[in-house]
Amino acid sequence: MKYCKFIILLLFCALLMNFQCDNDDVRQTDSCDGPVLVDNTTYQMSESSFYIVITAIIEDDCLNVNISSSGCDGSIWDLALRDSEDIAESMPPQRYLKLILVNNEDCLAVFNKEQSFDLSELRIDGVNQVILNIEDFPEALRYSY
């Protein structure tokens, strides 16, 4: 009887160990609208239409930006995020980004556009956060991962 209780206790412990979660560390990258292009040549050569960044907020692995620009309705605007590939050797490290807006609308009305970008390509091995400096945005953003 003593061995029976011991075996039941061992089986119960083994059963409890099976209830651990296997998928809690899976990143959700589907929620961002687009990627960041990490390319210094594109960063240097890209020209943008005029815009104003209203907000830039990091949530999980997504940078959510809200911009304002003139146009007819903003439906054909193309907004992209470029990284310079330059990494400032500070602690935490810093990266330099640029938003590129292609706006071929010739109207004088002002519209806003929201878009998100997947920041996971900007991670740096050996650290768990990076400071992001977006051109023409006054605040540096801290991306923790």
Regions found by a protein language model. Give the residues of each.
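Sec-dependent bacterial lipoprotein signal peptides
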Residues: 1-20
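Bacterial Sec-dependent N-terminal signal peptides
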Residues: 14-38
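Extracellular low-complexity Ser/Thr/Asn/Gly-rich intrinsically disordered segments
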Residues: 22-23, 32, 59-63, 140
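N-terminal edge beta-strand
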Residues: 42-56
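Mature extracytoplasmic domains of secretory-pathway proteins
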Residues: 58-105
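Short, solvent-exposed, Trp/other aromatic-anchored flexible loops in extracytoplasmic proteins
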Residues: 99-129
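Surface-exposed edge beta-strand/loop patches
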Residues: 119-145
